[in-house]
Every structure is written in C-alpha cells, then in structure tokens.
C-alpha cells in the first residue's frame, strides 16, 4: 500500500530515557544539592542539604532553615575539613552558584562580553580554593546526589513520621544516628581506584576568611570606609604604608564579625 501510495507511513516517535552520569573512578569529585520537601509534615519548614562523594556515595547531610549562601558555605566547610579539597564540585545552576549575568551569557545566541562577570560568593570561594565548579544541566547530570534525595524523600520521611519527629533538634538527631547510620554501610561503595584526588588544605587556605562574605571597599582620607551603610574607622596602630585610598578586602564572617585585609589581615573593624 505504501508503494501504491495508498497509505503514508508516519514517523515513529522514539522516547529517549534519561541516562544517569556514571560514577567517577577515584574519590575527589563532589556533588552538592538542597531539597525542599515536607520533611516534618506539620513541623517547621526545613531544607535537606547534602554533599556526596561521586566515587563512593559517602554523604554528609544536615538540616537548614534556608537554602542560603551561608548555609551552603557551611556545608562546603564541613566537607573541606573532613576530606580536603575536591577536584570539582557539581551543583545545579541556581543563583547561589551562578550570577544572572552569567546565566544570560550562557544562553544560546547571546553575544559574549569582553569581560567575565564577577562570581557569586560561593563561586569566589571555590576559585580561591582552586576547585572547579560544574553546573549540572539536569538532575541526572548530578548523579548520586539526586538518587540520594530520592531515597531520602521515601525512607527518611517515613522514619521521621514513625518516630514522631517534630522539631529541628529531633530531626538532626534522627538524621545523624538513624538515617546516615543506615546509609553508610548499605549504600556506600568501593571506588574503582584506591587513589584519592582530594588535595590537602594548605597554609594559605584560611577557611574562616575564604568562606566569608567578601567585598572590596576603598579607604578614605581619614582612614575610614563604608560597609553596609555604616562607617568604620581603622585604628592608627593598624595603619600600613599605602593604606590611604587603597582598595581593601572586607570579610564578613559567618558568625557576624568583620575583618579587613590589606596584604596581611588587620583586626576586626571598630565602628567610626
């Protein structure tokens, strides 16, 4: 009938399934993610933040009340102090990791500007630690961290409900003692290679400074500077050559204190 042109064969649509990214052969690549879910049903709203080693599926996880820059930097610090610096770092393409200008430039057909847009605070910290950031194009590209969340949304939620967990403190206890205690022996695997590509934290890697909120300010003639609508004065005993009119690095630490860095770190800033 086709040859007689009495019937025309239609094109058959072939469904292409998602393919999970294969595991890395050696330890040293991490993936990080945050999942909002009704973890405690009628309890407080919580986010589940986790980081996983791509080769072994070893996990670090915590509850946070917001998916903020500070919370993500805290998760990163935990990983760095436990394992060292990973070679690369998979996340989604949220604004915490990639600026709006960077996202716009990455769109097809958008002309690339002459200069690279400034990184986010997390992007800057990764750059100072010499860790490559990789923005996953899909949940499947993040691999093991997405499968971890799939398991958590089933098994963890059921466990929290069965134990009657209602508070953040109770959720922390159950997560550490029960869920991660089950995950470690049952879900982690041996890597294809015994090598570990993590790199140690060197002397120049001051995590308190690197994992701060960092901005640049110019010192005025009277050795003052403005930050967050406040005026701060630098003590005369801390003044170094060339400080007047210089651009200095302001570090707002995660516990709230401020420090100024001009070559060497200076004491926390007093208000003018």
Residue ranges and their predicted role:
Residues 1, 33, 51, 57, ...:
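Mobile genetic element proteins and their domesticated derivatives, centered on retroelements
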Residues 1-38, 104-117, 196-207:
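Basic, flexible linker segments flanking DNA-binding modules
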Residues 32-59:
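An active-site-proximal beta-strand-loop segment
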Residues 44, 61-88, 111-112:
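Active-site beta-loop-alpha junctions of metal-dependent nucleic acid enzymes
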Residues 65-66, 92, 238:
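A generic structural motif
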Residues 80-114, 136-139, 196:
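Acidic/histidine-rich, metal-coordinating catalytic segments
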Residues 115, 121-192, 197-209, 249, ...:
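Charged alpha-helix within mobile-element recombinases
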Residues 178-272:
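C-terminal, beta-rich DNA-binding module of retroviral/retroelements integrases
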């Amino acid at each position: 009938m086709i040859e007689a042109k009495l019937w025309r064969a239609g094109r058959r649509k072939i469904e292409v399934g998602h393919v999970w990214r294969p595991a890395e052969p050696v330890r040293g690549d991490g993936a990080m993610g945050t999942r909002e879910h009704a973890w405690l049903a009628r309890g407080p709203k919580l986010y589940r933040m986790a980081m996983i080693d791509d080769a072994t599926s070893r996990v670090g996880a915590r509850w946070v009340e917001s998916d903020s820059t500070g919370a993500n930097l805290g998760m990163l610090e935990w990983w760095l102090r436990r394992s060292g610096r990973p070679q690369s770092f998979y996340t989604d393409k949220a604004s915490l990791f990639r600026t709006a200008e960077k996202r716009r430039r990455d769109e097809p057909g958008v002309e690339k500007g002459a200069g690279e847009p400034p990184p986010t605070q997390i992007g800057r910290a990764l750059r100072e630690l010499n860790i490559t950031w990789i923005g996953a194009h899909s949940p499947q590209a993040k691999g093991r961290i997405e499968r971890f969340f799939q398991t958590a949304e089933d098994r963890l939620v059921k466990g929290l409900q069965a134990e009657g967990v209602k508070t953040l403190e109770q959720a922390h206890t159950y997560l550490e003692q029960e869920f991660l205690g089950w995950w470690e022996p049952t879900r982690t695997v041996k890597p294809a290679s015994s090598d570990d590509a993590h790199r140690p934290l060197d002397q120049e890697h001051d995590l308190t400074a690197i994992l701060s909120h960092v901005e640049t300010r110019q010192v005025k003639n009277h050795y003052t500077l403005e930050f967050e609508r406040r005026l701060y004065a630098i003590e005369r005993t801390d003044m170094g050559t060339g400080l007047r009119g210089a651009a200095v690095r302001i570090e707002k630490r995660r516990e709230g204190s401020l420090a100024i860095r001009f070559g060497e770190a200076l004491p926390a800033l007093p208000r003018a």
